[in-house]
Amino acid sequence: LSLGLMPYSIVGYNYSMTETAPSSITAGSLKTDYTYTGEGGITQLYFGLGFRPFSWFSLGANLQYYFGSIEYSSSASFEEVYVPTIMQRTISVTDLSGNFGVQFTIPLKKEMSLTLGGTYQLKSSVNADAEQTIITTDTVAQNFNNSFDFPMSFGTGFVFNYLNKFTIGFDYKNEFWSDVEFFGEKEFLDRNKFILGFEYLPNPNGRAYFERVYYRFGANLSKSYYTVNGEQLRSLVLSTGWGFPLKKGLNPTIMNFTFEYGLNGKVEGD
């Protein structure tokens, strides 16, 4: 049984570009400055259940509730026009989805084990309320309800454990964003994610409380599902966390805390 809250998608960018083209007004050229910004994100609240029919095999499922809002803005400023054209869009999301997973544990020796696993995320259509405002010499505002897709995805990975104290894991995940529609349009690219993690448990049966605390470190590398100047941005996220035992026994209760710090790639253009 698990319950958690985590970010699903975080949007945060601000970039600009300049284009020069022949002017239809004068004999010279016309310079246009474009600016694009985006901020906000979608959060996932999940509730999970697991079942182990055999000592070497287990399966589970998560029910996921998504909520949040994202604000997009784009503007075009023309050299010979004093009033820029600005488009602002705010999208609010609330909906449910789910995923499934299986894992197999292979005992290597008495003190070592290898666990292999896989996950599958359902493709789901998400309800969204959107407000769009276009500002020129006049202001036009629209409110509409529509839907867009969250992609199907699959993941696979392994976990190696030694002495029930040292654990290292690696996961690979592929999200099929190129198959989804965003307000009727397909405008994204598939996204890959690589995740590496390490966990240390000083003494599973120790008397001292902090000997039974789990200490965790991790990193993941991924590409964005959108492009900037024709390039996908790389993202690196570093994390650290702790698992605090609340109850001993064959099925212990553990409260987990995780902190993450992320770095997004930069794209330079003219």
Residue ranges and their predicted role:
Residues 2-270:
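Outer-membrane beta-barrel porins/channels
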